[in-house]
């Protein structure tokens, strides 16, 4: 499948594209990169641009807001065509689904959602389809459709935001259960390993990052729990790790601070 025409190699200021950039880790990535002077392509899947991103764009004139449902192949192709002349130095696959948010208001980013439907004996399988579509299918579609943009850039990096819950040896994580979320992150890791193998020849670096137990809007109910990390801290460290990785690191699964995570 070819999602966009080949690009000329053009020297430009560094550009990052972030999926799911309207809240949590994605919004923090957008904010910190914008603060550094990068051009930021911040995507969201809402009908209208969310206030979080319009506020950011009002502060930084190099923030570009785009609507994108990462599970919709035609929509991703359409945006790739629209941005076909834009080299993307760092492509961050951040959009993700963690649990059942069917009872949350569409714009309520603080709603924690429901983990109980991901416990064995109480599994709700339509949710599995949603989680796999966003967490596994989405990053693959986005990485392929925007590959020429990455290839045409100076830095040539693809990042997938994963989780220690994708580790086959890991035992820590969200409340008991979360079967769908855990298996989606394991699949994401293997998927990105394969992407790394396929793109190494082009000098593209692909890594998976575990942000750790991050206190985003949806985890505010965990405020005060030992070990929870501020979003600003994890993102600051992930950016440092992204800066440091090279083609020698492609295919690796790393913690936010660059430490190797177990598969």
Name every feature range the model reports, one short phrase each:
Residues 101, 167-171, 209-222:
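Short beta-loop-alpha junction of Rossmann-like oxidoreductase domains
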Residues 36-51:
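Conserved glycine-rich Rossmann-like NAD(P)H-binding loop of the short-chain dehydrogenase/reductase
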Residues 201, 208, 216, 220-263:
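C-terminal helical subdomain
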Residues 22, 26-31:
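N-terminal Rossmann NAD(P)H-binding glycine-rich loop of SDR-like oxidoreductase domains
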Residues 57-74:
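Rossmann-fold cofactor-recognition segment
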Residues 97-132, 137-141, 147-200:
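Catalytic loop of short-chain dehydrogenase/reductase
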Residues 71-87:
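Conserved Rossmann-fold cofactor-binding substructure of NAD(P)-dependent oxidoreductases
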Residues 18-19, 93-94, 157-163, 205-210:
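Structural signature of the Rossmann-like NAD(P)-dependent dehydrogenase/reductase core
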